Regions:
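Gram-negative/organellar outer-membrane beta-barrel architecture
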Residues: 97-261, 266-269, 337-343, 348-359, ...
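C-terminal outer-membrane beta-barrel translocator/porin domains of Gram-negative envelope proteins
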Residues: 257-388
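Bacterial Sec-dependent N-terminal signal peptides
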Residues: 1-22
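Short glycine-rich beta-strand segments
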Residues: 179-183, 232-234, 284-290, 323-327, ...
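Outer-membrane beta-barrel transmembrane domain signature
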Residues: 313, 364, 368-372, 380-423
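Outer-membrane beta-barrel initiation region
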Residues: 19-175, 251-276, 357, 404-410, ...
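Solvent-exposed, glycine/polar-rich loop segments of beta-barrel outer-membrane systems
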Residues: 246-248, 256, 333-344, 403-415, ...
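Extended hydrophobic-aromatic, low-complexity segments
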Residues: 36, 331, 371-377, 388-392, ...
Length: 460
């Protein structure tokens, strides 16, 4: 009798899990500019595929996330319907709301390692303005072209044609960038765990021109291999070498160099802008050599991220970043570790910790204070691409630890070769056009504490 009851209760569940649906049609609307093939090649299924019933919702969720991660759409809706001609067939309906793709480039950059450090110094001269244009989704193919002129703290230019997909499956992607930067200020050493700058009055401290080409192979939608080759010509003032003879490894004021980088990424996060579930594995090999082969440098860098929902409101995540480098000469420019790029410790925004090897670990507990809201801004009725806005707010608590090893540290850098820790609480505001605003109240083991601010993915 018990066996019969168990079979009676669970047989429908088993039969449902074994049911298969065939994708008979894929309908797309809302893509006024974006080509349909750009959308279909990001889907984890294609017309004619068979999907198990118990896997269907997860597959549709992945399709939605893949399309949002293109950064081409503010909203994506993926729905299913039973084909009227056959109950085992499904029609997939995809409705997208495109972003604005053509931007006059008016970009204000606060020239510091982070916004909090710039606010502390309040140096109005440390601002660079970019003026030009940037076009996303060129020809509806998700290509990006940009041209800009820099003035202010840095002067220079940038020309780029990037994200050029080759083939129907977007398995091969190319990018080209030409870049020039001319600055009268340069960070030439770290003292007391803070970057020290030399400001030249009459001449440029650093003049840099570079050209790079990168190629990406995507064997899967969320897995990529990238190779980048860069040629660079740099001229520095002799003052830099007088202030720090070990600035870049030799006594030349002019250098031509080649860089070769390889990057592997497996990005299984649900949403690239503000992930809450999934993981990221990133590994990077960097190689650098000047053209007379007297200065050589290599680095292995890794980044592991993991995101886990604990409930509808609570999430936990962890970020582990590490790097190990080798070089044949002592050079300050190759020793930048904690406080640069993605190796950060919240609460140490005002400090850097140089070294040849480093590791940082950043676990965070998050709580969804305000679920995602969608509002229509009627006063922007003349700008339909900006009128509909979404936003959500998360509270968070965090505890960071890190360590950087320096083989020949400056005696003034009191954080060298020490385990560091910090903690705090904060708020994150996430909204459209990939805008993330963060306010943290952090403290560190130096008994310092305060508010810190950051802005990611600015609108322009």
């Amino acid at each position: 009798m018990k066996l019969f009851l168990i079979i009676f209760l669970f047989a429908p569940v088993y039969l449902y899990s074994q049911q298969n649906y065939c994708i008979s049609n894929i309908y797309i609307k809302g893509n006024t500019i974006t080509k349909s093939k750009v959308i279909t090649r990001e889907l984890p299924f294609k017309q004619g595929d068979t999907i198990r019933a118990d896997k269907l919702e997860g597959v549709l969720k992945m399709a939605k996330n893949n399309l949002l991660n293109l950064s081409l759409f503010n909203f994506v809706y993926v729905k299913k319907s039973i084909n009227p001609d056959n109950s085992s067939n499904l029609d997939i309906n995809i409705d997208v709301e495109e972003r604005w793709f053509i931007w006059p480039l008016i970009d204000i950059k606060f020239e510091d390692r982070n916004l909090s450090n710039w606010i502390r110094t309040s140096d109005s001269k440390r601002i660079t303005l970019d003026a030009g244009f940037r076009i996303y989704n060129l020809w509806g193919l998700n290509h990006t072209v940009s041209a800009s002129y820099k003035f202010g703290y840095h002067k220079g230019f940038r020309l780029g044609y990037e994200n050029i997909s080759i083939g129907q499956t977007r398995s091969h992607v190319l990018g080209f960038v030409v870049f020039g930067q001319f600055s009268k200020t340069e960070n030439f050493i770290s003292l007391f765990n803070s970057p020290v700058y030399n400001r030249s009055v009459n001449e440029f401290a650093v003049k840099k021109i570079s050209a790079d080409i990168n190629y990406t192979y995507r064997p899967q939608i969320r897995v990529s291999h990238t190779v980048m080759i860069k040629y660079e010509n740099i001229n520095i003032s002799d003052t830099i070498l007088k202030l720090n003879p070990k600035y870049w490894g030799n006594s030349d004021t002019t250098r031509n160099s080649l860089s070769l980088n390889y990057i592997f990424i497996s990005d299984q996060r649900d949403n690239y802008q503000y992930p809450l579930e999934g993981y990221l594995i990133k590994g990077e090999l960097r190689g650098y050599v000047n053209t007379d082969y007297t200065v050589r440098y290599g680095q292995l860098r890794t980044n592991l991220q993991y995101y886990l929902p604990l409930s509808d409101k609570w999430n936990v995540c962890a970020n582990l970043t590490s790097g190990i480098s080798m070089k044949n000469v002592q050079a300050y420019i190759f020793d930048r570790a904690i406080g640069y790029e993605d190796a950060t410790l919240r609460g140490y925004e005002f400090y850097v910790n140089d070294g040849q090897q480093f590791v940082t670990f950043n676990p965070t507990l998050k709580y969804n204070i305000l679920p995602t809201k969608v509002s229509v801004l009627n006063f922007l009725s003349f700008l339909p691409k900006f009128r509909k806005i979404h936003f959500t707010i998360y509270g968070k608590a965090f505890f960071d630890i890190g360590y950087s090893h320096h083989s020949y540290p400056n005696i003034s850098n009191f954080l060298s070769n020490k385990f560091l820790c910090s903690g705090g609480v904060g708020l994150d505001l996430i909204t459209y056009y990939n805008i993330n605003l963060s306010i943290d109240y952090s403290f560190n083991q130096l008994k310092e504490h305060g508010f810190f601010f950051s802005i990611k993915s600015l609108l322009f």
